[in-house]
From Swiss-Prot:
CDD domains: IMPDH. It comes from the Bacteria. This is GMP reductase. GO terms for biological process: purine nucleotide metabolic process. The active site is at 174 (thioimidate intermediate).
Length: 325
């Protein structure tokens, strides 16, 4: 199988049919809701917190709350429901997580979205959790992952997952490929394309996004939604520590399998980096919206479906020619 990644692909323009890119509609439907953009900030502790989740929901964006403060999830779901906002949480597969599902069911609290968040999602433990959630909270939209193969997509969909997350270790602060020799790092876009050939339900591309153009490429190769970490890290509102060096502010960004997340140096598959503090999150979201509208106009359409139909070329690591933003 020939493989490629984001930097190897250039999408080919089609005849433009709009007078202005502002006519282009970058919204997307996932489950029973329509969202302003086909992007979701990674459910990582230095990317999202309750305040950011609430603001995203208020403004019409999709979010997935992380699972690293497990005792707060019940209250979070209650709060979001009381405010009339979508509730979207993450769970793992350990015994305590089953107890959370039981508690939600007992209190008649069904989150709109539940993401089963496991590094190697093609696992019996994930399938068992899908079955359990669907039994106890049948109305919840279940996202399961992460996987990197057609077999993984098939099994999770057959178990009842409503969407599958694709990507094993391509993220900027993930070192799975280095530590284990496994993953989709370096061929994430090909893995997405491969998985999309068998998927009957939405796919969420997770990891490896370095530019806004990569969002359009993900849509072209089968993603309904694109999960992004590094581009959403380092904002003024971002959780995590801030440091100042030579008058420049930096924000920390670490992987969910890093020792900074785990609190111990055991089974580490993530690292920490410091990112130049950016502006506000709303400005990044607006820039993504404008760039995606431009992508749609280059695709010759008015909405995201146009991007799925464009041709492409493989140019092997040469398209940027050293250019940077």
């Amino acid at each position: 199988m020939k493989v490629f990644d984001y930097e190897d692909i250039q999408l080919i323009p089609a005849k433009c049919i709009v007078r202005s890119r502002t006519e282009c509609d970058p919204t997307v439907v996932l489950g029973e809701h329509r969202f302003k953009l086909p992007v979701v900030p990674a459910n990582m502790q230095t990317i999202i917190n309750e305040e950011i989740a609430e603001k995203l929901a208020e403004d019409g964006y999709f979010y997935i709350m992380h699972r690293f403060e497990p005792e707060r999830r019940m209250d979070f779901v209650k709060k979001m429901k009381d405010k009339g906002l979508i509730s979207s949480i993450s769970v793992g597969v350990k015994d305590d997580e089953y107890a959370l599902i039981d508690q939600l069911a007992e209190e008649n609290l069904t989150p709109d979205y539940i993401t089963i968040d496991v590094a190697h999602g093609h696992a019996q433990s994930v399938i068992d959790m899908i079955h359990y959630i669907k039994e106890k909270l049948p109305a919840a939209f279940v996202i399961a992952g992460n996987v990197g193969t057609q077999e993984g997509v098939r099994e999770l969909e057959n178990a009842g997952a409503d969407a599958t997350k694709v990507g094993i270790g391509p993220g900027k602060v993930c070192i799975t490929k280095i530590k284990t020799g496994f993953g989709t790092g370096g061929w994430q876009l090909s893995a997405l394309r491969w998985c999309a050939k068998v998927a009957r339900k939405p796919l969420i591309a997770d990891g490896g996004i370095r530019t806004h153009g990569d969002i359009a490429k993900s849509i072209r190769f089968g993603a309904t939604m694109v999960m992004i970490g590094s581009l959403f890290a380092g904002h003024i509102e971002s959780p995590g520590e801030t440091k100042v060096e030579d008058g420049v502010k930096y924000k920390e960004y670490f992987g969910s399998a890093s020792q900074y997340q785990k609190g111990e140096a055991k089974n580490v598959e993530g690292k920490k980096i410091w990112i130049h503090q950016r502006g506000h999150l709303r400005d990044t979201l607006q820039a993504m919206r404008e760039d995606l509208q431009s992508s749609i106009s280059y695709a010759g359409g008015r909405d995201l479906e146009a991007i799925r139909k464009v041709d492409y070329v493989i140019v092997k690591n040469s398209i940027f020619n050293g250019d940077v933003l």
